[in-house]
Structure formats: structure tokens, C-alpha cells
Amino acid sequence: MRHRNTGRYLGRNSSHRDSMLKNMIISLIRYEIIHTTLQKAKELRKILEPLITISKINSISNRRNIYSKIRNNEIIHKLFNDIGPRFLKKNGGYLSILKSGYRKGDNAYMAYIKFTNTKKNI
């Protein structure tokens, strides 16, 4: 039975799914907006928003905690020095998902995911 198992499979096995979501986290922090399928964007939001909450307090233990999940010093530096302080007065809702229609070819529903207070346009 599948009781209390949360998350989407996204048509991949667990190791592929974990590495794909980790790469998407890195891309979103680096570029502050990415274009992906709606289901991947929703899954990414569930993973990244708690990391942003942790990054609002810049301590060595928080850095190590996030490093265990991301493993990229450049991204961790940007997360703690740029993105975390940007959301100090905000409690959640750091990411917004903007639907952008269907993809030509396989008709998958596409969306943009971005930080709510980013200066970059679509």
C-alpha cells in the first residue's frame, strides 16, 4: 500500500529523480528563473522553500546542513549572502509558479518557476 508516501515519481527512479531535482535547485538559484514542466516545478518548490528558510540565518551549522543536500559552494554562497537576506521579513511563499501553456511535441504543461522578488523577467 502507498499510505503516507508523498512526492511525485516524475517517470524516473529515485536516484535519477534526486539528481534531477538537485540540478534544478542549482539552476534556479543561479539563474533565479527556470522553465520546466508544472509537476517538476511543484516538486521543486516543496524541496527549495525549506532550504531558503534555513538560509535566512547564516550560521555554520545551517551552511553544513544545506551543503549536505546541494554540494555546491558557489550556490551555497549565493543562497546565504543574496537570496536568504532578501527574504528575511517574509515567512514562506518565496517561489512563484507561472503557467506557460503546453509544450509542443508531447503536450506537457509547462511553467516558469522563479523567486517572488526577482528582478528578472520571463
Curated annotation (Swiss-Prot):
The keyword Ribonucleoprotein applies. GO terms for cellular component: cytosolic large ribosomal subunit. Belongs to the bacterial ribosomal protein bL17 family. The lineage of its organism: Bacteria, Pseudomonadati, Pseudomonadota, Gammaproteobacteria, Enterobacterales. Part of the 50S ribosomal subunit. Contacts protein L32. InterPro entries: Ribosomal_bL17, Ribosomal_bL17_CS, Ribosomal_bL17_sf. Keywords: Ribonucleoprotein, Ribosomal protein. The keyword Ribonucleoprotein applies. GO terms for molecular function: structural constituent of ribosome. One of its GO terms (biological process) is translation. The gene is rplQ. It comes from the Bacteria. PANTHER family: LARGE RIBOSOMAL SUBUNIT PROTEIN BL17M (PTHR14413:SF16), RIBOSOMAL PROTEIN L17 (PTHR14413). It holds the Pfam family Ribosomal_L17. This is Large ribosomal subunit protein bL17.
